[in-house]
Amino acid sequence: MNHETEVKESKSFSKTITVNKPHLETYDRIRNFRGWWSEEIEGNTDRVDEVFFYHYKDIHLCKIRLIEAIPGKKLIYQVVENEFSFIKDQSEWVNTKLIFDISPMGNATEVRFTHEGLVPEYECYQVCNDAWTGYITNSLKNYIETGHGNPNPKDKDGFNAELARKWGLN
């Protein structure tokens, strides 16, 4: 690993949550992106080498592949394709990784989410920071603990609509 890679990893977006569920159940809930990120996801989100498609209107479209899965411990997804309607450099998310490190802590579990490669220098960083913070600290946490997250709904406004209004992306 060279110095540039180390710096990029250390500056990558990251959030840590603690949930009151066992690590294996936590792992299973994370893999169901429809339960906490978006009901409009197409494809499998829980099988290694499978690619799923996420979109929110024409504002954000991406294809993501699960590249590593260690039950109860770790999930790594790689962004294969990405398009944002509100930035110039469409390569910002391409080849970045969504990493979920899962650690048992007594009766609870710690989940550290890192979007490796999503760094403050990126044009999308502030919007993406807001989005991931909401999805990880609210929707994913609630989904793991109660079975009810707050994914972006198919047929009505949700968290993404709030973000689009806040950042003037409509």
What are the roles of these predicted feature ranges?
Residues 16-20, 53, 65, 101:
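Generic structural detector for well-ordered beta-strands
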Residues 46-54:
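Short coil-to-beta transition motif at edge beta-strands of beta-rich domains
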